[in-house]
A protein has these predicted regions:
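Acidic donor-diphosphate engagement hotspot in glycosyltransferases and nucleotidyltransferases
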Residues: 73-74, 102
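A short, conserved beta-strand element in the Rossmann-like catalytic core
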Residues: 21, 68-69
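Buried hydrophobic side chains on well-structured beta-strands
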Residues: 59-61, 67, 91, 118, ...
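Short beta->alpha connector loops
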Residues: 94-98, 161-163
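Radical SAM enzyme [4Fe-4S]-AdoMet core and its adjacent flexible, acidic
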Residues: 11, 26, 31-41, 51-52, ...
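N-terminal pre-triad scaffold of radical SAM enzymes
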Residues: 1-26, 57-63, 242-247
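SEC14/CRAL-TRIO lipid-binding/transfer domains and related phosphoinositide-recognition modules
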Residues: 1, 7-8, 12-13, 36-52, ...
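Alpha-helical scaffolding within the catalytic cores
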Residues: 98-106
Length: 247
């Protein structure tokens, strides 16, 4: 089977600094799930899979149960991919981990072989309502450091009722910062319940108003009427929550 693999989805860690209500690693935001096992992907296991996949072209560092950058072995995990010069890497993160210098060095190291998706669900006053436990200023500074060092970054946005009024402003900011694209999540992790990660108070997070509207496929891009607004020059595509649909 490994000899046929061309792209590989990797979960580097089950650790995370965030407490997003829709994530399976916690109880709708308040406390971690009882069955959650905290660990990092074994380096030997990753090395074995990569080395035995001769047709492998693309690797995705993502996380259903954690953030890749929270891994205690992320540098070594990245090195395993880096030393295979034919591999490209897509890294998904909330962006609120590591230092600006770390992000700068990452961009310089991988150059065009790396694309980072920063999960930013609004401006400073709104973002952390869902992305609990993250720091918007730190995310923006890390993204700037990565982009300014030559890195290719995409702004990933989950639309909710509480942040949809900021979509246009987020698109503008992404363009001003030099993001290469703005990504909407197709099937967001909406849940019936959402709680504050410290108090357990009900947050009442709801889907956005256009959640049930039909999206139109055109030239391999999924577009809705937001694409028609003149301020949008960045191609907007939608993808599923584990990013299994690619441009």
């Amino acid at each position: 089977m490994l000899d046929k693999i061309k792209w590989l989805h990797v979960e580097p860690s089950s650790r995370c600094n965030a407490h997003c209500p829709g994530c399976a690693r916690n109880n709708q935001g308040f406390g971690t799930a009882d069955n959650l096992i905290i660990n990092d992907l074994n380096l030997e296991r990753l090395e074995t899979v990569v080395s035995k996949s001769p047709k492998l072209e693309h690797v995705i560092f993502c996380g259903n149960m954690g953030d890749p950058c929270a891994s205690k072995m992320i540098n070594q995990q990245l090195d395993i991919i880096f030393k295979r010069q034919n591999l490209s890497l897509q890294l998904h993160t909330n962006g609120s981990l590591r230092t600006e210098e770390w992000w700068s060095q990452l961009a310089k190291k991988f150059e065009s072989r790396l694309e980072v998706w920063f999960a930013i669900d609004g401006l400073k006053d709104i973002h952390s309502f869902y992305r609990q436990g993250t720091n918007w200023d730190k995310i923006i500074n890390n993204a700037k450091s990565f982009i300014n060092s030559g890195g290719r970054a995409l702004w990933q946005f989950i639309p909710f009722a509480h942040n949809e009024h900021q979509i246009k402003d987020c698109i503008k900011l992404s363009q001003n910062m030099g993001f290469a694209g703005f990504k909407f999540i197709k099937d967001a992790r909406y849940s019936n319940n959402s709680y504050h990660y410290r108090t357990g108070k009900d947050l009442g997070i709801k889907p956005w108003s256009k959640q049930n509207e039909t999206w139109i496929r055109k030239n391999n891009a999924y577009l809705n009427n937001i694409q028609d607004q003149k301020i949008v020059k960045t191609k907007i595509k939608k993808t599923d929550c584990v990013h299994m649909i690619f441009p």
